[in-house]
């Protein structure tokens, strides 16, 4: 069979991700001609990689989304040449593959004689249409894989379909004018079709997103990327269990790193953690032994590590460290890990031992003491914030990331047995007034990082098991804490501004950031480098604008710069290609779940049944767009769903028409306003 393949590619950051190469390389043996059409720029290095599995690469402007790319690819091949193919596959970058051999589905499809086209998956009919003023979204093949046979390629109607395609400028346009239209359009012209994995086998309208594990069990070779960054509330409504999809992909033999190193650039942190099941209840194990749970190598054979403990100025900070049992907790770490204490003021040997449980030498108590394996050392840093975050990123990176200074790609001196790790621990006081809830949150964070030798060994092994894991943060607590509105604490604007300044490629969570509680976490040094460089630039610019060190420190404190950097810790790691995980002990998992389940039941007792309905119900009454119309819509949807479904097409038609009229009136008004205006007059006056 003479088979061609047109692969649409787009990446907002102008990268060709490894999963794209994996998919194309696996398809190369099954296609006589591979054309990649990219709506985003391709660098020389990526082009060289693509040339190993593509015959042609067509780069074009980002116009028309996938529809524009397919049309450009067909025109590039030539309409007359299309008839030379027995089959032409139109496919794209929206999936990971192969999770099963292509041969299985291609061999099965080869037996479908007499058809004009076939698809990999399909979407069921939906009534009413989910977003248009129509009664129904028709059943249709999904556009991420449509294989067109010679019979349709040679039909002039195929060319006419593409050349008369309406302008496509949005995801909904693509669904309306191509994906949901292609199947029915050509079926009405007498062409027959097949689907490899019919929707009738499954219990949802969109199994590619809502039942992806079931598709994999049935042998589907591809996994839709959207399943990992789709709205978690939608997935919850469809009973999609976060984590099962990633587990199913790994069980099928696909690389977890290929998936997570890509999706971190698309999903927000919270969506990714929920959809991929990245909240870990760490199982303890015996260090240096193989237990029933996590298998652990000898501590002497582990990658090297460094723990940086920040002690604020004042005697009460040392006393707080003792009250936290910090010395006992630090004993949970492998003995060869280095312990570095940072503080704005010198600490004597007795204080260092009280805090760390390790006996320092006279040299270790100097303001910038040398350090070797297994010792405790002191570094006196500038007092720029209560938790020493800025100092950790700007004055201590040579301690936790020695590889960067040597020009290495990865930090540490691990002898090739994995990256070095850094553990960051802070001691109160926290910014602002203290409450019992703050004490609980601080204790929970310490437990989730330094609960016991077995637990901490399991946490270290988590990084060995997942090479793409960049930062592990204590799971978010909620006991005794307020949950009023977005939890960026007034720093959302500053976080967005600094994110742009740092060149972060990920989208910040709109409501609640994924941030390390108490600025405590375990991480790979490489995952912190972007944040460290950004903090250094921030300090440098502040010092240039200030009269002296005291004024620059005051400006950083007034701008809450350290808090913003803490909020961006996870997002900076994701922008570097690392994924985050939330970690907690089994004891805290039980405590938090029990309290949260009770809160959920009490809060939702008088709300609609499902969480997505509850959110819409509350937003209609208390959200930024609350109003009578929103209340009526949610009331009808909840109490009279059949009536709501019947009225939606008419409602969309009327509101859509009103919007069109409003836009037309505005445009006409502007034209009338300009009548008689002298040429060259400023229209902004």
PLM region descriptions:
Residues 1-408, 416-685:
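ER/Golgi luminal nucleotide-sugar-dependent glycosyltransferases, focusing on the catalytic module
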């Amino acid at each position: 069979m003479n088979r061609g393949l047109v692969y649409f590619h787009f990446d907002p950051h102008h990268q060709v991700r490894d999963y794209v190469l994996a998919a194309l390389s696996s398809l190369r043996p099954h296609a006589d001609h591979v054309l990649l059409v990219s709506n985003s720029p391709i660098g020389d290095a990526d082009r060289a990689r693509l040339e190993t599995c593509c015959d042609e690469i067509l780069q074009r402007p980002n116009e028309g989304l996938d529809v524009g790319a397919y049309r450009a690819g067909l025109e590039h091949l030539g309409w007359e040449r299309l008839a030379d193919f027995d089959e032409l596959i139109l496919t794209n970058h929206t999936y990971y593959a192969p999770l099963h051999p292509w041969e299985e589905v291609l061999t099965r499809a080869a037996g479908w004689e007499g058809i004009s086209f076939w698809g990999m998956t399909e979407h069921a009919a939906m009534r009413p249409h989910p977003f248009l003023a129509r009664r129904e979204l028709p059943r249709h093949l999904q556009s991420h894989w449509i294989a067109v046979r010679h019979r349709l390629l040679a039909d002039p109607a195929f060319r006419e379909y593409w050349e008369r395609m309406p302008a496509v400028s949005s995801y909904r346009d693509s669904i309306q004018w191509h994906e949901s239209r292609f199947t029915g359009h050509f079926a009405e012209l007498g062409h027959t079709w097949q689907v490899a994995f019919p929707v009738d086998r499954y219990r949802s309208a969109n199994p590619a997103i809502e039942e992806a594990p079931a598709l994999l069990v049935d042998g589907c070779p591809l996994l839709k990327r959207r399943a990992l960054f789709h709205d978690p509330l939608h997935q919850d409504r469809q009973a999609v269990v976060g984590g099962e999809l990633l587990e199913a992909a790994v069980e099928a033999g696909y690389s977890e790193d290929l998936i997570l190193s890509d999706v971190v650039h698309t999903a927000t942190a919270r969506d990714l953690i929920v959809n991929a099941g990245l909240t870990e209840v760490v199982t303890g194990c015996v260090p240096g032994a193989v237990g029933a749970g996590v298998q652990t190598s000898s501590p002497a054979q582990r990658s090297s590590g460094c723990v940086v403990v920040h002690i604020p100025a004042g005697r009460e900070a040392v006393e707080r460290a003792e009250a936290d049992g910090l010395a006992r907790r630090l004993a949970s770490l492998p003995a060869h890990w280095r312990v570095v204490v940072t503080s704005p003021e010198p600490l004597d040997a007795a204080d260092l031992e009280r805090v760390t449980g390790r006996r320092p030498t006279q040299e270790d108590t100097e303001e910038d003491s040398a350090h070797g394996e297994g010792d405790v050392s002191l570094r006196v840093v500038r007092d720029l914030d209560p938790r020493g975050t800025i100092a950790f990123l700007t004055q201590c990176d040579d301690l936790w990331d020695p590889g960067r200074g040597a020009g290495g790609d990865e930090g540490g001196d691990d002898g090739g047995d994995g990256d070095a790790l850094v553990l960051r621990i802070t001691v109160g006081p926290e910014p602002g007034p203290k409450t019992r809830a703050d004490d609980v949150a601080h204790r929970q964070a310490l437990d989730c990082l330094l609960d016991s030798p077995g637990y901490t060994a399991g946490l270290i092994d988590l990084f060995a098991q997942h090479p793409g894991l960049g930062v592990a943060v204590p799971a978010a607590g909620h006991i005794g804490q307020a949950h009023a509105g977005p939890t960026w604490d007034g720093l959302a604007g500053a976080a967005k501004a600094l994110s742009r300044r740092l060149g972060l490629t990920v989208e910040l969570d709109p409501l609640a950031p994924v941030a390390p509680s108490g600025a405590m976490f375990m991480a790979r040094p490489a995952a912190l480098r972007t944040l460290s460089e950004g903090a250094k630039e921030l300090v440098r610019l502040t010092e240039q604008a200030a009269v002296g060190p005291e004024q620059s420190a005051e400006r950083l404190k007034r701008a809450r710069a350290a808090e913003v950097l803490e909020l961006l810790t996870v997002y900076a790691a994701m922008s570097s290609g690392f994924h985050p995980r939330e970690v907690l002990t089994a004891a805290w998992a039980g405590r938090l779940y029990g309290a949260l389940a009770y809160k959920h039941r009490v809060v939702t007792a008088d709300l609609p049944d499902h969480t997505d309905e509850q959110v819409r119900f509350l937003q209609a009454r208390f959200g930024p767009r609350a109003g009578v119309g929103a209340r009526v819509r949610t009331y009808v949807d909840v109490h009279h769903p059949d009536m709501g479904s019947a009225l939606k097409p008419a409602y969309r038609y009327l509101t859509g028409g009103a919007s069109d009229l409003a836009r037309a009136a505005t445009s006409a008004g502007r034209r009338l306003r300009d009548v008689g205006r002298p040429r060259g007059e400023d229209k902004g006056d």
